[in-house]
């Protein structure tokens, strides 16, 4: 067995977790109470597959290997009283009494630290149920207080306790359209600095990019968080499908790092997903393999706002789902390689890693997304994602030049030096991206 424990931290993490577990349950044929759908003798996905994410109890009930953590009770109370309340073990839902007030320092040093012991105990219990734990899957936001502060604190602790296990993150990057607080740039820079050496691979999800996709592709005039989360859940499901169903590529978490991370700090692959279609448009689209593959290289299908045509690709994984034939995939990849718009770094072989999972994508009943025969999720490590860091660093600098809001952080026991240290680390990260994008033959000429 190669089990994965999911950890959802903060409001965004917990709400994305809800959307994901609803989707996983549908995909594996598990009802909201944790029992199998009528007519099924075992969950879909094969014995090996589903048990990476679900644990079977002695009573034939399936319980997610997941933990929800938030410093204020509202979001987790919705899970406790919602349609999936019987799916989760009550001890897996951990909430505090007062929130982090959008303050990284409260989540990391004061309020978050009080709840840390309980969370780690619960993670140990889940880990004890596993025969061969392969790692952890985090979902949290970078801009909130709990997601950034407690999220990074947990990652640090897990690094110390489970050093060799993989730690993958789905991190929500802040955006002006759905911004909830003015200090998001501070929280983002501080948490990125703290987790840079602890996370093995971080898939960033930019709220602005998802917001635009919902408006453009799903015809939702003013997308809500629920709309955004349904789309994010589809992406998370596609990335984890090869772990949960029998697939040929990225069958375990280590493989993501091996395929996508050329240097430990450059671990932020860009995620693209296609097709994103509303139910009304689905019947008018053919969605051939070459169409959905080409769409992944278009900026409009990316989860982070940046232009890959300005950067270079270091590594690419294409994860297909559904009715897909290898020959069509090879042809589609050849077409992409022949295009002049896709630039690859010259020090890396031009291989595109391909994975095919024959289980087609599913859409939840209340989602705006259409159910399609095939879909593709592309994970690509490209230098253009550095644009996202540039944007947030610029916002950080504008506020920090005036030392705006800094007293709230210092008041929670944080030292002001941490701000400059974190900012310098992100400046170094921006430089790292420039260096890996530079042509190696240009460097050789300098010597």
Curated annotation (Swiss-Prot):
Name assigned to this protein: Tubulin alpha-1 chain
PANTHER family listed in its UniProt record: TUBULIN
A GO biological process held by the record: nuclear migration along microtubule
Molecular function (Gene Ontology), one example: GTP binding
Consequence the record notes for mutating residue 255 to A: Poisonous alpha-tubulins that cause lethality. Microtubules do not depolymerize
Gene3D superfamilies registered for this protein in UniProt: Helix hairpin bin, Tubulin/FtsZ, C-terminal domain, Tubulin/FtsZ, GTPase domain
Taxonomic path: Eukaryota, Fungi, Dikarya, Ascomycota, Saccharomycotina
UniProt subunit comment: Dimer of alpha and beta chains. A typical microtubule is a hollow water-filled tube with an outer diameter of 25 nm and an inner diameter of 15 nM. Alpha-beta heterodimers associate head-to-tail to form protofilaments running lengthwise along the microtubule wall with the beta-tubulin subunit facing the microtubule plus end conferring a structural polarity. Microtubules usually have 13 protofilaments but different protofilament numbers can be found in some organisms and specialized cells.
Source organism superkingdom: Eukaryota
Enzyme Commission numbers on file: 3.6.5.-
Reaction catalyzed: GTP + H2O = GDP + phosphate + H(+)
Other facts: Present with 5590 molecules/cell in log phase SD medium.
Keywords assigned: Cytoplasm, Cytoskeleton, GTP-binding, Hydrolase, Magnesium, Metal-binding, Microtubule, Nucleotide-binding
Entry-linked InterPro entries: Alpha_tubulin, Tub_FtsZ_C, Tubulin, Tubulin/FtsZ-like_C, Tubulin/FtsZ_2-layer-sand-dom, Tubulin/FtsZ_GTPase_sf, Tubulin_C, Tubulin_CS
Signal peptide span: none
GO CC terms of this entry: cytoplasm; microtubule; nuclear periphery; nucleus; spindle; tubulin complex
Residues that bind Mg(2+): 72
Reported function: Tubulin is the major constituent of microtubules, a cylinder consisting of laterally associated linear protofilaments composed of alpha- and beta-tubulin heterodimers. Microtubules grow by the addition of GTP-tubulin dimers to the microtubule end, where a stabilizing cap forms. Below the cap, tubulin dimers are in GDP-bound state, owing to GTPase activity of alpha-tubulin.
């Amino acid at each position: 067995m190669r089990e994965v424990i999911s950890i959802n931290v903060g409001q965004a993490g917990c709400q994305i977790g809800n959307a994901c577990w609803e989707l996983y349950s549908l995909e594996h044929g598990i009802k909201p109470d944790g029992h199998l759908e009528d007519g099924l003798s075992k969950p879909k996905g094969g014995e090996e597959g589903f048990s990476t994410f679900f644990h079977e109890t002695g009573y034939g009930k399936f319980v997610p290997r997941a933990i929800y953590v938030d410093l204020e009770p509202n979001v987790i109370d919705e899970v406790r009283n919602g349609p999936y309340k019987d799916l989760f073990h009550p001890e897996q839902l951990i909430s505090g009494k007062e929130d982090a007030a959008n303050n990284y320092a409260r989540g990391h040093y004061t309020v978050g630290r009080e709840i840390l012991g309980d969370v780690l105990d619960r993670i140990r219990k889940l880990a004890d149920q596993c025969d061969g734990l392969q790692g952890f899957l985090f979902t949290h936001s970078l801009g909130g207080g709990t997601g950034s502060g407690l999220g990074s604190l947990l990652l640090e602790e897990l690094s110390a306790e489970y050093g060799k296990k993989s730690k993958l993150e789905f991190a929500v990057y802040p955006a002006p359209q759905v911004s909830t607080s003015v200090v998001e740039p501070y929280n983002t820079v501080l948490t990125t600095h703290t987790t840079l050496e602890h996370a093995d691979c971080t898939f960033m999800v930019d709220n602005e990019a998802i917001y635009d996709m919902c408006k453009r592709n799903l015809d939702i005039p003013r997308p809500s968080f629920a709309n955004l989360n349904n789309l994010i859940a589809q992406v998370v499901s596609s990335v984890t499908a090869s772990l949960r169903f029998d697939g040929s590529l990225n069958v375990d978490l280590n493989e993501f790092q091996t395929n996508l991370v050329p240097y430990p700090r450059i671990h932020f692959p860009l995620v693209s997903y296609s097709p994103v279609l509303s139910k009304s448009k689905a019947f008018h689209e053919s969605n051939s393999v070459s169409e959905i593959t080409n769409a992944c290289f278009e900026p409009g299908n990316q989860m982070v706002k940046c232009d890959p045509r300005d950067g270079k690709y270091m590594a690419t994984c294409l994860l297909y789902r559904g009715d897909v034939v290898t020959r069509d995939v090879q042809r589609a990849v050849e077409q992409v390689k022949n295009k002049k718009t896709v630039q690859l770094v010259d020090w890396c072989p031009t291989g595109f890693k391909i994975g095919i999972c024959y289980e087609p994508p599913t859409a939840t009943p209340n989602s705006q997304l259409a159910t399609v025969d095939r879909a593709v999720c592309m994970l690509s490590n490209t230098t253009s994602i550095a644009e996202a860091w540039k944007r947030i660093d610029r916002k950080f600098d504008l506020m920090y030049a005036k030392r705006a809001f800094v007293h709230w952080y210092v008041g929670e026991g944080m030292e002001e030096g941490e701000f400059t240290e974190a900012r310098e680390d992100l400046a170094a990260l921006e430089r790292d991206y420039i260096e890996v994008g530079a042509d190696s033959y240009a460097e050789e000429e300098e010597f």
